[in-house]
């Protein structure tokens, strides 16, 4: 399965945080889709 995105850190640029949350949302969608 997909690997869980790693949190870039509180001091990361806003772009990295946005990218992380987008990747996390896609990751959760894939994980929950396969689980049920």
UniProtKB/Swiss-Prot annotation:
* Coiled coil, from the record: none
User: Matching PROSITE patterns, A to Z?
Assistant: PANCREATIC_HORMONE_1, PANCREATIC_HORMONE_2
Q: Give the InterPro entries listed for this entry.
A: Pancreatic_hormone-like (IPR001955), Pancreatic_hormone-like_CS (IPR020392)
GO molecular function terms listed in the Swiss-Prot or TrEMBL record? neuropeptide hormone activity; neuropeptide Y receptor binding
Q: Where in the cell is it found?
A: Secreted
Write down which residues bear the modification named Tyrosine amide.
Answer: 36
Q: What is its main location?
A: secreted
Gene Ontology cellular-component terms listed:
extracellular space
The UniProt entry's GO biological process terms, in alphabetical order, are: feeding behavior; neuropeptide signaling pathway
Sorted keywords for this record are: Amidation, Cleavage on pair of basic residues, Hormone, Secreted
Member of which family?
Belongs to the NPY family.
Tell me, in a sentence or two, what this protein's role is.
Hormone secreted by pancreatic cells that acts as a regulator of pancreatic and gastrointestinal functions.
Q: What is this protein called?
A: Pancreatic polypeptide
Q: Which organism is it from?
A: Meleagris gallopavo (Wild turkey)
């Amino acid at each position: 399965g997909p690997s869980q995105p790693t949190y870039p850190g509180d001091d990361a640029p806003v772009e990295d945080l946005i990218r992380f949350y987008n990747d996390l949302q896609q990751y959760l969608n894939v994980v929950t889709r396969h689980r049920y």
